[in-house]
Amino acid sequence: MAKQGFSYYKAETDRFQDIKIKRLKKRYHCTGYAVYQYVLNEIYRVRGYFLQFTEDHLFDVSEYWDIDEEEVTAIIGYCAEIGLFNAQLWQEKGVLTGRSIQARYIDICKVCKKAAVIEEGLRLVPAEQVAPAPPPLPSLFPGEEFPAMRIVPGRMAAK
């Protein structure tokens, strides 16, 4: 399978002037900003435009910054509340993405001369900016489903 994410992404020099970043820093100090940047890095590294946040991701962030998992969850919830991540996708699907994340993904794809494909149920940018999704691959085991675990705020659930 081809790599979906990126090895690098651009960071705007005026990001510290963003009111959302200021609110995050005021509430959670440097820890909040560190968690946000870690998750943002994972979004671009793994899939390019979203992250299905799992218990493993929660552990990784917590372990990397040496903070409680509950605090990580609270910080991510606050990031969704203030609009750094899409609140609806976070609450309903445990997915971390946002309009600005997807716009940056599209920009990076253009520079890399790569088709920008965003799943319909996750797309927050206008449809004309993204390439049509390729048809799904046939199942190796027809009729069998293997549910993936994901985090839905407040509980674990099968996908």
Show where each model-derived region lies.
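Short acidic, hydrophobic short linear motifs in intrinsically disordered regions
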Residues: R47-E63
